[in-house]
Amino acid sequence: MIIAPSVLSFSYDRFNEQLSDLNSSVDWLHFDVMDGNFVPNLSFGPDILKTFRRNSSLFLDVHLMVNDPGYFTDVFANAGADSITFHYEAYNDLRKCEILIEKIHSLYLKAGISIKPNTDVETIFPILDKCDIVLVMSVEPGYGGQKFIDSSLNKIKKLDEYRKQKGLHYVIEVDGGINDRNAYDVIENGGDALVAGSFIFDGNILNNVEKLRNIK
């Protein structure tokens, strides 16, 4: 299991304390980048990523919720990303998605594709052999603290079945409403990486991470 706290929920007034806890307990850090167009909210730019890169050796997982992921790919690659995931819905065109995946790989980064809750997961099957990460949004993207959408479990299961059928090795990452009550179902259906914001940062980080680790 990969635990990937969402930096959207990070308390910057407790930067050193919280990052120290994360550095000692989790696997990835997940950065939701929003442009105010693809999703209603704005989040942060590459300088935040650079700050984390200087202070952490964790895998930095960038999720682009933007209208022009090609532009932001260069910016965040230069800031220290280890992976860049973008939305199929930014293009609604598999060939354009393939081209950007190739570009991300040319920068020696892991490449991921993400889908919103209303997108049929089978839409992206033709390009999954090119992907290192498939990110299932289990809430509508753009806001933290939402309730997990149960129908996401069927998408996760389909992705896992397709992965086994085709002998592929992409990581199935799940983002939205993750907690210690639904994480078991996510893992049971084939999920590999849990993106959690509110659940990890509300209260004691180390204790909350341990609750996820203990899920069998």
Name these PLM-found stretches:
Residues 3-6, 29-31, 60-64, 84-86, ...:
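Hydrophobic faces of well-ordered beta-strands that scaffold small-molecule active sites
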Residues 15, 22, 32, 76, ...:
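Conserved, mostly hydrophobic/aromatic
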Residues 17-22, 70-78, 119-130, 178-193:
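Catalytic cores of alpha/beta
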Residues 30-103:
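N-terminal active-site wall of soluble small-molecule enzyme domains
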Residues 35-43, 47, 117, 125-157, ...:
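Glycine/Thr-rich beta-alpha phosphate-binding loop at enzyme active sites
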Residues 42-62, 103-112, 152-172, 176, ...:
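Alpha-helix-loop-beta-strand connector modules within alpha/beta enzyme cores
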Residues 84-92, 135-145, 189-209:
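Glycine-rich phosphate-binding active-site loops on the catalytic face of alpha/beta enzymes
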Residues 100, 155, 187, 199-216:
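C-terminal helical cap(s) of enzyme catalytic domains, especially alpha/beta-barrels
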